[in-house]
Amino acid sequence: MIAHKQKKAKKKRVWASGQLSAAITTSEMGLKSVSSNSIFDPEYIKELVNDIRKFSHVLLYLKEAILSDCFKEVIHIRLDELLHMSKHQNLNSVDLQNAAETLASKVKAVNFTEVNDENKNDLFREVFSSIETLAFTFGNILTNFLMGDVGNDSILRLPISRESKSFENISMDSVDLPHEKGNFSPIELDNLLLKNSDSIELALSYAKTWSKYTKNIVSWVEKKLNLELESTRNIVKLAEATRSSIGIQEFMPLQSLFTNALLNDIHSSHLLQQTIAALQANKFVQPLLGRKNEMEKQRKEIKELWKQQQNKLLETETALKKAKLLCMQRQDEYEKAKSSMFRAEEEQLSSSVGLGKNLNKLLEKRRRLEEEALQKVEEANEHYKVCVTNVEERRNDLENTKREILTQLRTLVFQCDLTLKAVTVNLFHMQQLQAASLANSLQSLCDSAKLYDPGQEYSEFVKATSSSELEEKVDGNVNKQIASSPQTSGYEPADSLEDVARLPDSCHKLEEDRCSNSADMTGPSFIRSWKFGMFSDSESTGGSSESRSLDSESISPGDFHRKLPRTPSSGTMSSADDLDEREPPSPSEAGPNSLGTFKKTLMSKAALTHKFRKLRSPTKCRDCEGIVMFPGVECEECLLVCHRKCLENLVIVCGHQKLQGKMHIFGAEFIQVAKKEPDGIPFVLKICASEIESRALCLQGIYRVCGNKIKTEKLCQALENGMHLVDISEFSSHDICDVLKLYLRQLPEPFILFRLYKEFIDLAKEIQHVNEEQEAKKDSPEDKKHPHVSIEINRILLRSKDLLRQLPASNFNSLHYLIVHLKRVVDHAEENKMNSKNLGVIFGPTLIRPRPTTAPVTISSLAEYSSQARVVEFLITYAQKIFDGSLQPQAGVIANTGAIAPQVDHGCHPKPLLSPDERDSDHSLKQLFFSSKEDIRTMDCESKTFELTTSFEESERKQNALGKCDAPILDNKVHLLFDQELESASHKTEDTCKSPKLLLLRSDRVANSVQRPTPRTRLRPVSLPVDRLLLLAGSPTERSSRNTGNTDSDKFGKNAAFEGLHRKDNSNTTCSKVNGFDQQNVQKSWDKQNERNSFTAKTTVIIPSAYAEKGLAVSTGNNRGHSSGAAQPSKAHADPARSARDTSEHSSSDSCPVAAVRAPRTLQPQHWTTFYKPPNPTFNVRGTEEKTAFPSAAVPPVLVHAPQSHVAKSDPDLEATLACPVQTSGQPKESSEEPGLPEGTPTCQRPRLKRMQQFEDLEDEIPQFV
């Protein structure tokens, strides 16, 4: 049924379209008659005047409606009356239609809710101007019509409306069908469709057909535009090649004309490309596709809505049918019950008296059944009525929905037609403009070609060749001009016998013609002398010189100096023709960047720093790592090789020296990269971190958002090829972050070594425990009244410092640099949304990970990820307290010859997080975090001296144990006396050693008045491996000696307060070998003297004045204690009940000697306790083991500073005298730490005091402060 109606509608549309075409034809025929005869018809003129007067009145009514504060509907009605003035089709032109559309858009754009007396003139200014424009346009069109100047192009070919009464359609009104006269209004269209039962399906099918139709149109336009675009590109290439070929050929007929034609082709092709781009963008394709997609979307929604409404109506109709059947069934049941009741009554009347009682019961039962049946009938009738009401409501709803859908579809179709009309006008209008410009240019070329006289150029050529008397003069002028021209200086002058001389006037004329006709030619402009017999057959027949090699010499065997000029590449030749290194570059090519023939090649910023030349031999490209054959270039300075096509993406800057080979960085051993840097920090870390800090600290999601994988791999490859010379400014910040994370992730062993993994995981658990305690206590009023840094946090800080000092110098410096960089990222967390917790999650598994194994992943190993993140978060949060802004130098930087390693580039060091003033203002808080391993380090190994220092450790510990009340007074006196002696001694050391001046680490002069805790001199037991027990049993200096070598001297200060505070352990440290002086010989002599000279508890040291005159500075202090002054040997296993927390607290409070100078060394435990095998002693070791022991408490502290030259020449008696006093109790022999191990030969062994245990117990009762 639907298909049949669609066929009928199609037949009607075909018939209507044929009638419309006939109407248009009749209209076109009538226009001529109107233009010729209607003007002289008095009746038509009278009617026209009346219509014009009515049009002016409508304009006035519209203006008055706007000025008289009418409602919006009134203004729109007036505007609608104005726009429907379409009676005279001869006056309905494009300009008038555009003016009317402009007026309508201006009126609709006014927001009438905001109109008042104040802003009325401003809001309606554009409307009034549009009304005046419409009136002016109408007047012009009317004048042209009356004057007979109306053109057919300006008249719109619109369908003739019912109101259009003119001579060409009067006869047609009598034959048109009633329902086909003119255009229907939108309401009439909807009413017509409502009469049809299948109106929704017809409208939806039309919308679907419109979508398919539009799809085909868009497909045709897109394919056509693509073909035209490809054609224009080929035309441009062909025109460029042809123009460059015919441009060098002179005296050719119509040469300028064809050159202009080629230029016109190029210009028109460029215009066509712009037109195609516009049509593909917002002029045709995109708007039409958008409208089609919207049509499809709304059509599907409308279809779904219509199906839902139909299903609802079907459900209600089904319910109505069921209700009707139920009513009929109930009625039948009621009739049966009623007849049964009637029979029962009859039986009762005819029955005897004895059966009356039973019949009464039966009668009552049947009466009850009859009533129930009647009740069911009434209920069924009520349900039926409800169903009937529901069906009526559904039908009304369906009718309303049908009307709304038809209105929506009609509006949608109108909008789609409007869009299709607009884009179609754009399409043909732009094509018309393109064709018009092309037609004009072709017409001008045709006119120019008609003016050419055949043989004109040949005559000019003959005249030029026959003027032999002026050959030398012209040849000299030409050669002079060639030599002076900067664009042709690369070409040698031709021989005079082969040159074709021309007259000066013809020369100038030719030069002017070439400049005017070939102004846009690419390549050098030059004056070329003709040579006879120099054309090959292929050139003369083919018409192009591209088939020959433009780099080759002349074809003539006798012409060794002439070279053909090189034409630029047209896209079809090899790109190697521009790389002729046999020709010296011209002055114009030898610019500041020395681009030469690469001016047309796209280059990156890094590529512009190179000075390229043609590649001499095949090799590998540094950019893409492909094989470079002939189309390759090579830098003259750094010898970088790459393809020409890779110059656009090159990121390696010229280093003006030979570029190093490729270095495998990602996945390589860390020490391989670190040993090539002065400070041990990989250049990848420094480059990436500095670039991120310069432009991406406020970038949201830094280090969290992933970058482009291809660009990241490109940057990794460039860093391996160019190392420090890579310019990473062209890459995005996320790509740089990915490179940094990838480098850290691919390290075989992270910055925090595998052997320290367990300690850091335990540290993370302590951090978690402390955080939980702080969370529980942060709301208590006591903490709010007395805010202070938790002692547990301070202890964790000191333990973390102790663990970090066990890292090698390069690992420590790299970790230091990275953590400080991440701290700066966290400082901008408000902008980048990356706090320390987020960064800990990202960098935790990268910086701290266990040794890889083949064991399967367990839940415990997964749970350690949070611990890894927590440690990194803690390091970032307390970076100011853990790292102090300076880096450790690498170990082993001094060679056997005493040469000093290159200085560390301080520009690469992390910037200090606080200024000195801020440090001083915050000094009261940071005093709690001083650690001997952090604040006291050795000086540079290139110093020419060593210092032998002692301390008041035993006396201070005795004072703290005997009386806490006298501790501050004694401490102040001892420190004041000792500081004065140290200052005088250190000044002498400066003069002797000529070492760099030491800077102040802190400048707090009131530190002497603060009571300082006494550090322990013994170790508490802890559950660690044997080698770690040996490491912890030694002094802090001994534990960290392998990590510290020559350190930047700017880190240390001479503040007397802190020197007195930290001088509690003294040790003898020397460089292994400086200026040929071997420290091991002195150590052996000291050991021998130690064996012979064993001092008791009351031994004193007497140094003659003769030795002081030789350069020894002696400072003697008074010892105030005698009862328990003996040194206490270290007992690693003395008290197994002590906890690991006390152990870490004790080890963190150990101290080191101040400014002790020695070479870095490696701790070598006894070989029978571990698997470690001690290496053979060489002169390259960082230092020898120090075997020190403390004398009795009665010995006054002695500070000796002696130059190496004096020590080397000192007497044996002096060595014997200095042997034992310089040994400290804080550094006992390793063999004495393990009671169960074989004992070596001890040096200056002392008996254990009887009251040792008492002092230890008393010391435990004294509160310890960090």
UniProtKB/Swiss-Prot annotation:
Entry keyword annotation includes Zinc-finger: yes
Supply the CDD domains for this chain. C1_GMIP-like (cd20816)
Q: Which UniProt keywords apply?
A: Coiled coil, GTPase activation, Metal-binding, Phosphoprotein, Zinc, Zinc-finger
Give Gene Ontology CC terms: cytoplasm; protein-containing complex
Output the SMART domains linked to this UniProt entry: C1, RhoGAP
Sequence ranges of Low complexity compositional bias:
538-556
**SUPFAM superfamilies noted in UniProt:** BAR/IMD domain-like, Cysteine-rich domain, GTPase activation domain, GAP
Where does the record place the modification Phosphoserine?
Answer: 166, 171, 174, 185, 496, 516, 549, 915, 951, 1023, 1149, 1151
Q: Please report a single Pfam family linked to this protein.
A: C1_1
Picking any one GO biological process from the record gives: negative regulation of small GTPase mediated signal transduction
Residue ranges with Polar residues bias: 1115-1127
Keyword ATP-binding tagged: no
Q: What does this protein do?
A: GTPase activator for the Rho-type GTPases by converting them to an inactive GDP-bound state. Has strong activity toward RHOA, and weaker activity toward RAC1 and CDC42. May act as a specific effector of RAP2A to regulate Rho. In concert with RASIP1, suppresses RhoA signaling and dampens ROCK and MYH9 activities in endothelial cells and plays an essential role in blood vessel tubulogenesis.
What's the protein called, per UniProt?
Rho GTPase-activating protein 29
